């Protein structure tokens, strides 16, 4: 199965988001999988999530770290070497870098070159996770770029048989990382 869960909900009201977060947190706890929340620092604190992931247009990494403390996971989205180095300096535990391929789950992103991805991965000492447009057909193209892992949405949730999709993806991932 999966090794890390990030709850990313852009269209839910606060109460529905809270209920969903509690439900997913309990499921993650049952399977010993870290659970983080995207963008919503207050909700992450309220449900005692394992961490938070923020983008470049959200709260600054150092401010998030000050709120969540040293023991929670902090992930930061980056698209340049400069952003990556700053996020690491400000307390990020890992980076989400991309989009590495065209994606339908985020409207305002551009696709990074694989050379730039390699540069970002080489510039920092914390884990770097590839994000954006990754699927069974293109995952092998990430080999050798320096990523520590991948982040998936539609490659899992857009499939008719989610369990089968996860197993096939996990097999491919094991060849790369």
Task: Give residue ranges: language-model regions.
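N-terminal active-site wall of soluble small-molecule enzyme domains
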Residues: 4-70
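Catalytic cores of alpha/beta
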Residues: 35-50, 64, 79-91, 123-130, ...
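Glycine/Thr-rich beta-alpha phosphate-binding loop at enzyme active sites
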Residues: 47-49, 54, 73-122, 161, ...
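A cross-domain feature marking catalytic cores of carbohydrate-active enzymes
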Residues: 7-9, 37-41, 56, 78, ...
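Surface-exposed amphipathic alpha-helices with a cationic face
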Residues: 18-29, 62-69, 85-88, 118-122, ...
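Structural motif corresponding to alpha-helix initiation and N-cap regions
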Residues: 14, 38, 58-61, 80-81, ...
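Glycine-rich phosphate-binding active-site loops on the catalytic face of alpha/beta enzymes
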Residues: 56-64, 96-108, 136-172
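Long, low-complexity, intrinsically disordered polar/charged segments
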Residues: 1-14, 88, 92-99, 121, ...
């Amino acid at each position: 199965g999966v090794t890390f869960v990030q709850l990313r909900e852009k269209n839910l009201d606060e109460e529905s988001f809270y209920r969903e977060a509690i439900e997913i947190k309990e499921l993650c706890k049952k399977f010993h999988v870290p659970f983080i929340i995207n963008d919503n620092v207050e909700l992450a604190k309220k449900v005692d999530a394992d961490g938070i992931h923020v983008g470049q247009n959200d709260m600054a990494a150092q401010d998030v770290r000050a709120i969540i403390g040293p023991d929670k996971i902090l992930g930061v989205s980056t698209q340049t070497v400069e952003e990556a180095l700053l996020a690491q300096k400000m307390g990020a535990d890992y980076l989400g870098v991309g989009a590495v391929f065209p994606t339908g789950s985020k409207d305002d992103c551009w696709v990074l070159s694989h050379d730039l991805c390699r540069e970002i991965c080489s510039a920092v000492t914390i884990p770097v996770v590839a994000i954006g447009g990754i699927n069974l057909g293109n995952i092998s193209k990430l080999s050798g770029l320096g990523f520590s892992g991948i982040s998936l949405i539609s490659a899992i949730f857009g499939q008719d048989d989610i369990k089968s999709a996860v197993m096939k993806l996990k097999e491919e991932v094991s060849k790369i990382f």
